[in-house]
Swiss-Prot record:
It comes from Rattus norvegicus (Rat). Signal peptide: none annotated. The chain crosses the membrane at residues 40-60, 79-99, 110-130, 135-155, 218-238, 258-278, 279-299, 301-321. This is Solute carrier family 35 member E4. Putative transporter. Belongs to the TPT transporter family. SLC35E subfamily. Keywords: Membrane, Transmembrane, Transmembrane helix. The keyword Phosphoprotein does not apply. The lineage of its organism: Eukaryota, Metazoa, Chordata, Craniata, Vertebrata.
Length: 350
């Protein structure tokens, strides 16, 4: 986990974003970099972050592979319907767990999040149904770049300079991986690109509602799941009613996979919301790049996918960018000891 300075949000951290510092710096407008006394995440909060991250990574990798299995092996040609079922499962699961109603003052923000949530999920599943699993996962590695830009533009958050540097290998690695897998349909790649952009926007919205408005993960997921379900169910009814082949009602294996996919979706979304409440939108998506390796292995084992040499170079670059992002303070300290980085003069550095 990155040890960059953290925001004063009780036990919550903004990971490597360091958007707030102590009083005197606030009087002069934008906070200085770096803060004098960075906060350290307490052991209980750190344990919650680790558990939520592990659950999120495992559920995400399993759900992506299972969804691809449903689309490919069972011929389930209804990605919008599957997305709607995911949202319905979230609404049912969170109905009794929501702690309090959403304040009326933020209803519009919640509805906007629901629209972004549902659209990103639909585009992701539509893209996944048409392209190989490995390519679908590699496309998501550019999400941290969109999240970094949106958090700076929309929320005014400041980032460690090395975090911007880490976006280079992260996105270059994704570009190399995509260049090595150009056999995929252009339409599927387009849906994946839209889903990636919307996923970054969604995380910024979630982070603001969870941390600034103090909503809990279950309440926010419940509030967004019902509007998202209505949106996705309507889209599935209009776009997939006559286009996809009829569903086999007696295929017990298919419906068992669909139910398991819905369960994994609920677990994944709850863990994602919890991570956003404890860390930040950018940290979550950089962590999400870890699922790429797991899904590449599963894609090779389950579907016989093979990556080119350029794609493996892209994976190595992506992992190096992740290392730089999560260890920006350690890298900066190492460079400072060798005279390559001057903390007091941000203009002079690596």
């Amino acid at each position: 986990m990155c040890r960059c300075p953290l925001e004063h949000h009780e036990v919550r951290m903004t990971s490597a974003e360091a958007i707030a510092v102590a009083g005197s710096a606030q009087e002069h407008g934008r906070p200085k970099w770096p803060p004098d006394k960075p906060q350290v995440l307490g052991q209980p909060a750190l344990a919650r972050v680790v558990v939520a991250a592990l659950v999120w990574l495992l559920a995400g990798a399993s759900m992506s592979s299972l969804n691809k299995w449903i689309f490919t092996v069972h011929g389930f040609g209804r990605p919008l319907l599957l997305s709607a079922l995911h949202m319905l499962a979230a609404a049912v699961a969170c109905h009794w767990g929501a702690q309090r109603p959403v304040p009326h003052s933020i209803h519009r923000r919640v509805l906007l999040l629901s629209l972004t949530f549902g659209t990103s999920m639909a585009c992701g599943n539509v893209g996944l149904s048409t392209v190989p699993l490995d390519l679908a996962q590699l496309a998501t590695t550019t999400t941290p770049l969109f999240t970094l830009a949106l958090s700076a533009l929309l929320l005014g958050r400041r980032h460690h300079p090395l975090q911007f540097a880490a976006m280079g290998p992260l996105c270059l690695g994704a570009a190399c991986s995509l260049a090595g897998e150009l056999r995929a349909p252009p339409a599927g790649c387009g849906f994946l690109l839209v889903a990636t952009c919307l996923r970054g926007f969604k995380s910024v919205q979630q982070s603001a509602l969870l941390q600034e408005e103090r909503l809990d993960a279950v309440t926010l997921l419940y509030a967004t799941s019902l509007p998202s379900f209505c949106l996705l169910a309507g889209a599935a009814l209009v776009l997939e009613a006559g286009a996809a082949p009829p569903l086999p009602p007696t295929d017990s294996r298919l419906w068992a996979c669909v139910l398991l996919s819905c369960f994994l979706s609920v677990v994944y979304n709850l863990a994602s919301f919890s991570l956003l409440a404890l860390t930040s939108a950018l940290t979550v998506h950089v962590l999400g790049n870890l699922t790429v390796v797991g899904n590449l292995i599963l894609s090779r084992l389950l579907f016989g996918s093979h990556l080119s040499a350029l794609s493996y170079v892209g994976i190595a670059l992506t992992l190096s960018g992740m290392f730089l992002y999560h260890n920006c303070e350690s890298v900066a300290s190492w460079a400072t000891r060798r005279g390559l980085w001057n903390r007091d003069q941000p203009g002079k550095g690596l």
